[in-house]
Design a protein with these regions (language model features):
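Terminal domain-start segments
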Residues: 19-103, 203-224
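Repeated scaffold domains used in trafficking and secretory/extracellular systems
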Residues: 42-45, 102-110, 162-165
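N-terminal secretory signal peptides that target proteins for export/translocation
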Residues: 1-2
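"Short basic amphipathic alpha-helical interaction patches in structured regions
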Residues: 72-81, 125, 135-142
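Acidic/hydrophobic-patterned starts of short beta strands in beta-sheet-rich repeat architectures
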Residues: 48-63, 113-128, 179-197
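Extracellular-facing segments of soluble proteins and assemblies that are Gly/Ser/Thr-biased and enriched
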Residues: 96-133
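Bacterial N-terminal signal peptides
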Residues: 6-16
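Acidic, small-residue rich beta-repeat scaffolds with periodic aromatic anchors
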Residues: 19-37, 129-224
Length: 224
């Protein structure tokens, strides 16, 4: 398994959520078809991610797949469920390993209210381990609209390619961090995602001082 160096990750405001009971986590693993002994780490919480008063179960699980090849030895999955009595009913799933082409690790969940409406959006973090010389942590931001859950933004929140001399062109050997600008994002009612990008190195050369730039990304269409 590829080694993962300690990374500084994006600072996101995580809303207070109810910690899931141990039996809820076990129910999630069972629903996913994952044995408890294969779970490397997990984030399981209850939060309101759909309109209405009811809370849903949101889980990100990092687990051993049982596959022998390095690319697919670990899996990272996000699943969202509603509860029906004692049952968990699947609503949405995101397989980070499938989307990334394997080589994933250290999945985590963040519960975020990006538009201030009281219904939270979902963030799933994971490490991209495709290249030993590139340290990258990624984030998918998932929103819910009339069409259901969808990935509204996906990108790197921590990236360092300064050591990848052979694999990455010189002009892409950057190092940076991204941090959510929650206040500005909420001012747009979640239509635009604001990020502060801190550049530490550019084209393989460390900057004398880190440089911050503001980035914007579309999240939701403007309401008529």
């Amino acid at each position: 398994m590829k080694a993962v160096a300690g990374l500084a990750v994006i600072a996101l405001v995580v809303l207070p959520v109810s910690g899931a009971r141990a039996d809820t986590a076990a129910d999630v693993y069972k629903q996913m078809g994952i044995k408890v002994k294969d779970v490397m780490n997990s984030s399981v919480a209850t939060a309101r991610v759909l309109p209405g008063d009811a809370k849903q179960v949101v889980a990100v699980v990092t687990y051993l797949t049982g596959k022998k090849d390095e690319a697919n030895a670990l899996g990272v999955r996000l699943d969202v469920y509603r509860t029906a009595g004692a049952e968990l009913v699947p609503l949405f799933t995101r397989d980070a390993a499938k989307e990334n082409g394997g080589y994933v690790g250290r999945g985590e969940v963040a519960i975020l209210d990006l538009d201030g409406d009281g219904v939270s959006e979902i963030g799933i973090y994971y490490d991209n381990l495709k290249n030993d010389l590139i340290q990258e942590r990624r984030l998918d931001v998932i929103v819910h609209d009339a069409a259901g859950f969808r990935v509204a933004w996906s990108g790197s929140v921590s990236y360092d390619a300064t050591k990848a001399v052979r694999d990455v062109p010189p002009d892409r050997r950057d190092r940076y961090l991204r941090k959510l600008d929650l206040d500005n994002t909420r001012r747009t009612k979640g239509i635009t995602l604001f990020m502060t990008k801190t550049m530490i190195a550019v084209a393989g050369s460390r900057l004398p001082q880190p440089k911050q730039v503001q980035e914007t990304f579309p999240l939701k269409p403007e309401e008529p």
